[in-house]
Amino acid sequence: FDNLENCIHIVINAKTDKKTSYEDCNTRLSEIENLIHQKEPDEISKKYPDKSQFTSSFKKENFMKAVRKTKDYIANGDVMQVVLSQRLTKKFQGKPIDMYDALRDMNPSPYMYFLDMEDFQIIGSSPEILVKMEDDNITVRPIAGTRPRGITEAEDLQHEIDLLSDPKELAEHLMLIDLGRNDIGKISKIGSVELTERMIVERYSHVMHIVSNVKGTIIDRTKPLDVLRATFPAGTVSGAPKIRAMEIINELEPLKRGIYSGAIGYLSWTGDLDTALSIRTAVIKDDLIHVQAGAGIVYDSVPETEWEETMNKAMALLKASEKANEPKEDW
């Protein structure tokens, strides 16, 4: 598959000692082409899975109470934004690798990963760079501002218009752009930090997001782990200012976050670093699957809306887990 040209090249080797080689190759090419087109994308339900199938670390009323408490902290000047999350847990009887396959089909994302840690598995489809370092260049790509996908193209476009005209979402995103600039500014050469993409909309299977791109050139002798240390945790999953936001998260969230909002990536022998923010990520352990999702709380937040945002973000993983529980011949 050619990602640049967005096309597939099919190559068949012909045997030169057979008179029918040309016809055989054409037949095989047709067979492969038919296989490529055989599986149509699944129709993805936009409805929430049956709530009786999963439990939450936050009852809905408790989550909304935590949102109101966070807004009190914001009104008192403690903090500008806090990202509150809930963890959803349900039974999982399938194979973890089938969960990865289902997620790859239903919610393809820039970062796809399957980590088998023997007694548990981590499976994810993260849309967001935590931080990337290549040669002397570093990138952070804040994602903030969310709407569910529309059922029709017209509804989808209307959701995008609503998202880009929502003062609350825009203010939240601008705050996180500034935080990203500040994070990489600590390890970048003076004058090198720039905003290369500003407030574009990216679409995924169940949600769309506002996304921006911030780049800088690192100070000489800066190591990859210095870069990770300067940018972790991401403001998009903690808040601003970070330390006070994390204190409030520790107070209000009923469970420690674990892998959620951490980092998954690699450090190469050449010193390059590429890390995904571990959101849209599931942990499977002891026949249970755990999915966590958050929402950025600001002064204008509506508790019910923020709860719905966490559910929308968890949707792709919950639906993929349902598919992975089915016999694979039914896919």
Place the predicted regions along the sequence by residue.
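Extended alpha-helical targeting/anchoring segments
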Residues: 1-331
